[in-house]
Amino acid sequence: MYAVVDVKDKQFKVQEGDTLYVPYHSDATAGQELTLDRVLLVSDGDGDVTLGTPTVEDATATARVLEHVKGDKVIVFKKKRRKRYRVKRGHRQQYTQIEIESLNANGPASSDDEEAAETSDAEPDEDPEAEPAEA
């Protein structure tokens, strides 16, 4: 099973257990669990693909923050010839490393849904073969 998720306007193809670098989340700390609810596409691996418009309803991905890291240095060099103008600057972009723990095509399971399923599976009090009472 794989999914395409949108994290801060960047799209990533993810599977359970994947580790990836996403744009920096300033409010997330190492070890914190994130719920990625902007799932654009879900595939179960058997060729069955669900495409969202723009997102797939009730589909989520759960991820754990591993650490905050900086990317490779990008050198910005400006120069104007014959004018003795040269500026050299460097920049390191910040990223958040996350690990995908689970993909849920039907959204997160809640206790209310489980209770409703248990109630619907319970046998009815009345005998279905009994004849209805006449009024």
Swiss-Prot record:
UniProt GO BP: translation
Keyword RNA-binding found: yes
Family to which this protein belongs: Belongs to the bacterial ribosomal protein bL21 family.
Keyword vocabulary terms for this entry: Ribonucleoprotein, Ribosomal protein, RNA-binding, rRNA-binding
PANTHER family documented for this protein: 50S RIBOSOMAL PROTEIN L21, LARGE RIBOSOMAL SUBUNIT PROTEIN BL21M
Superkingdom of the organism of origin: Bacteria
Biased composition (Acidic residues): 111-135
Record-given protein name: Large ribosomal subunit protein bL21
Gene for this chain: rplU
InterPro entries the UniProt entry points to: bL21-like, bL21-like_sf, Ribosomal_bL21, Ribosomal_bL21_CS
GO molecular function, one term: rRNA binding
HAMAP family to which the protein is assigned, alphabetical: Ribosomal_bL21
Keyword match Iron: no
Disulfide bonds: none
PROSITE patterns from the UniProt entry: RIBOSOMAL_L21 (PS01169)
